[in-house]
């Protein structure tokens, strides 16, 4: 459904926007990948990154399923005449997706990988997400090529790789795109930000009431002001500048590969 449109931002129009009743069909679809498939999330921070780094834009927008995460993108959708639908933030959606996939008809075919953060959080988070099933884990501070080799070395014939990447934006999107090119089989790659840390309970979630009104970012800023000051206090005004600039600039397009570009 569309609302009254003030702007047209091609990046926002690339989102897969869903209502709550569409979530279960999406989980079914993602649980039966027919090719190497990337799931990712666009929030205010990610939107800023893809304005500032051309390579990040290219990788980020090659994600097959780019989902709306947060109140900032909700407002951007409204300005672009789009019904924002459900807020599919990764911290809630990813555990639901993994549980759904592992209990689907293909559940026993999945081979599980976790990439990101550092030990013991990598293994603790993976164990929580994967329900105690066996998995292969590697921290998030290795050269990019090491992740490609890590997956290739551990792949088993006939298995479907399910790879959770918790390296943060935009590195995890770059790794996912490289793996997508390398894997010649169905696979599910999930760009999860701090999902392994949250699953390991390294960081606390905001109370449910705060999450419900879309203000978890403010809670996180309060808990980690030094680390998140630039992301939110500086980043939020930047975000609205980019939204308005891109929505009004006729020299903006999206290539067939999904990359955001500015025409010369």
Task: Place the predicted regions along the sequence by residue.
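Short glycine-rich anion-binding loops that position phosphate/pyrophosphate groups of nucleotides
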Residues: 43-47, 167-172, 195
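Conserved beta-alpha
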Residues: 73-154, 158-159
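N-terminal nucleotide/polyanion-binding subdomain common to many enzyme families
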Residues: 1-94
């Amino acid at each position: 459904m569309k609302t009254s449109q003030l702007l047209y931002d091609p990046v926002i129009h690339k989102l897969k926007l869903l209502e709550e009743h569409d979530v279960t069909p999406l989980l079914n679809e993602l649980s039966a990948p027919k090719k190497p498939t990337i799931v990712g999330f666009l929030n205010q921070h990610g939107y800023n990154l893809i304005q500032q780094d051309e390579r990040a834009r290219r990788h980020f927008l090659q994600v097959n399923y780019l989902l709306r995460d947060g109140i900032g993108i909700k407002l951007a959708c409204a300005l672009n005449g789009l019904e924002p639908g459900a807020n599919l933030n990764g911290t809630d959606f990813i555990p639901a997706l993994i549980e759904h996939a592992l209990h689907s008809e293909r559940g026993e075919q999945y081979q599980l990988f976790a990439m990101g953060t550092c030990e013991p959080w990598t293994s603790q988070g993976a164990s929580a997400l994967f329900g105690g099933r066996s998995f292969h884990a590697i921290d998030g501070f290795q050269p990019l090529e090491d992740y490609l080799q890590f997956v290739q070395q551990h792949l088993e014939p006939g298995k479907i790789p399910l790879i959770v990447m918790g390296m943060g934006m935009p590195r995890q999107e770059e790794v996912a795109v490289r793996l997508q090119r390398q894997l010649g089989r169905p696979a599910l790659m999930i760009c999860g930000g701090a999902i392994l840390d949250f699953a390991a309970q390294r960081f606390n979630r905001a109370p449910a009431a705060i999450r419900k009104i879309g203000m978890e970012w403010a809670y996180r800023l309060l808990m980690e002001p030094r680390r998140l000051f630039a992301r939110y206090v500086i980043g939020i005004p930047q975000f609205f500048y980019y939204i308005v600039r891109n929505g009004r600039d006729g020299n903006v397009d999206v290539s067939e590969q999904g990359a955001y570009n500015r025409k010369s």
